[in-house]
Amino acid sequence: MTKIVRSKYKASRRLGVSLWGDGKDAFNTRNYRPGQHGQNAMIKTSDYGLHLKAKQRLKCHYGRVTEKQFRNLFVLAQKMKGNTGENFIGLLESRLDTVVYRMNIAPTIFAARQLVSHGHIKLNGKKADIASIRLKEGDVIAIKESVKQIPLIQESVSKQGQTTPGYLSFDVHSLTGKYLRVPALSDVPYPFEAEVHLVIELYSR
């Protein structure tokens, strides 16, 4: 098991939820904090602590998004018309690595980022190797021909039709997908309750 896999499962236990809904997640069998006294720990969480944990859960769900990137997206969401929380989620869900993950091209958000950074993904026919690229409605994603038979990709796309959200489309034969629209919070298949309002309150202080 890689260092990333070990640390991501620890994050689930530390934050008290299965962050990615992974059946292999240790949280499913040990739903208490990691460490010697994790099972018996009595922790009283402050109001600030609740807000912070909500932010950490949401941020961790998106993989290796830095705190600076996360906050900058919040600032941008504030400047946009409409509801800040909905705007914030829309921005997070329009990232290239997130879309690759949601389309089941990769089994995890970490693997999705790696596929992008290694140049294995095309955006509108051109190589795209920056995970934070924001997609627009109608943008088309494709897997490079040379890597279509990679077992990781083949195994992941075999799950199509089960969890691909409605704001995306994906063709399992051509291995191409389209970003159809900006999702609402209720559209996003989080495996835990995403308390976006608490994140907004935290960053608005």
UniProtKB/Swiss-Prot annotation:
One of its GO terms (biological process) is ribosomal small subunit biogenesis. CDD domains: S4. The keyword rRNA-binding applies. One of its GO terms (molecular function) is structural constituent of ribosome. The keyword Ribosomal protein applies. Signal peptide: none annotated. Residues 94-157 form the S4 RNA-binding domain. GO terms for cellular component: small ribosomal subunit. SUPFAM superfamilies: Alpha-L RNA-binding motif (SSF55174). Keywords: Ribonucleoprotein, Ribosomal protein, RNA-binding, rRNA-binding. One of the primary rRNA binding proteins, it binds directly to 16S rRNA where it nucleates assembly of the body of the 30S subunit. With S5 and S12 plays an important role in translational accuracy. Part of the 30S ribosomal subunit. Contacts protein S5. The interaction surface between S4 and S5 is involved in control of translational fidelity. Belongs to the universal ribosomal protein uS4 family. This is Small ribosomal subunit protein uS4. It comes from Rickettsia akari (strain Hartford). The lineage of its organism: Bacteria, Pseudomonadati, Pseudomonadota, Alphaproteobacteria, Rickettsiales.
